[in-house]
């Protein structure tokens, strides 16, 4: 698995609620068209300083991720990002599964 984590900061003038609504209603539908995207999770941050949301996109390989970067779908999603995201920090991350489900938690 190849995963990229994004820390996103909303544009000045957007409330946290407006940021999340745009992300959910406009941006996520654009990213659903990415071929090779295996998983996409978004974590809005509740209150406080720092990023307004984290997102993790997972692919089978770095090549699969790179392949979408050159597509019109990706360019459209990036253009949309510029309308509501001031800054994005990105990181290639590993994955250490901890809990597979509620049944995995036992004393």
Language-model regions: role of each:
Residues 1-107:
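Macromolecular interaction modules
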């Amino acid at each position: 698995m190849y995963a990229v984590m994004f820390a996103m900061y909303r544009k000045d003038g957007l409330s946290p609620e407006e940021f999340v609504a745009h992300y959910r209603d406009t941006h996520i539908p654009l990213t659903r068209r990415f071929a090779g995207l295996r998983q996409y999770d978004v974590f809005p941050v509740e209150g406080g300083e720092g990023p307004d949301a984290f997102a993790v996109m997972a692919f089978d390989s770095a090549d699969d991720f790179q392949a979408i970067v050159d597509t019109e779908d990706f360019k459209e999603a990036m253009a949309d990002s510029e309308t509501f995201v001031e800054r994005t920090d990105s990181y290639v991350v590993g994955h250490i599964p901890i809990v597979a489900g509620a049944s995995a938690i036992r004393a």
